[in-house]
Regions:
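Ser/Thr-glycine-rich phosphate-binding loops at phosphate-binding pockets of nucleotides
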Residues: 160-166, 176
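Nucleotide/phosphate-binding catalytic cleft detector across ATP-hydrolyzing
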Residues: 1-157, 172-174
Length: 176
């Protein structure tokens, strides 16, 4: 199953799942509520208090945990849940300004050799993240119109997020 995740500074989003605030709380005991994720002996709940801006999102586990929430939401939204091991391919993005320096580390952060076991809303998930592909964030939006963009000498793609704005300048695309 291919799952695309936008790890925004304000929200984490997938194609079909609900957007979630980029904030998470960790607890050793099960907190009250329905939207509880258990992973590695700890419990996690989403928080309205977003994670402060991080240039490098791989410095701790929080964006990985947010990704588990997003993966579970996307699996459910697509009606693709199975109790067996679910192979997952991730498509992730980085701001164009950070892509060259961080894309390899971002891929390593998500890719796992072993299955990942977690529960969300008291349902057990067994996933194996097989492949991880990282793309410049603004380019994902442009990919939908590459044919049209190839007819102009240059195009400026803007990605306006909750707290940031990124751009990507495309020059002289060749339509094949």
């Amino acid at each position: 199953m291919l799952i695309a995740i936008d790890h925004g500074n304000k929200q984490v989003k997938t194609v079909h799942g609900n957007a979630i605030v980029s904030g998470v709380q960790k607890s050793k005991t099960r907190p009250y509520g329905r939207d509880v994720l258990k992973y590695g002996g700890s419990y996690y709940t989403l928080s309205a208090q977003r994670i402060p801006y991080q240039k490098d999102k791989t410095t701790d586990e929080r964006f990985f945990i947010l990704s588990l929430f997003a993966i579970a939401e996307e699996i459910e939204a697509q009606g693709a849940y199975t109790s067996g091991l679910m192979p997952i391919d991730l498509a992730i993005g980085l701001p164009p300004a950070h892509f060259g320096a961080q894309n390899k580390a971002f891929v390593r952060y998500f890719k796992r050799k072993e299955p990942i076991y977690f529960s969300y809303r008291d349902k057990l998930y067994s996933i194996l993240i097989r492949n991880v592909q990282c793309y410049p964030q603004a380019f994902a939006a442009a990919a939908m119109m590459l044919g049209e963009l190839a007819t102009v000498p240059r195009a400026l793609i803007l990605d306006v997020g909750g707290f940031t704005a990124d751009y990507l300048l495309l020059l002289s695309l060749i339509h094949i």
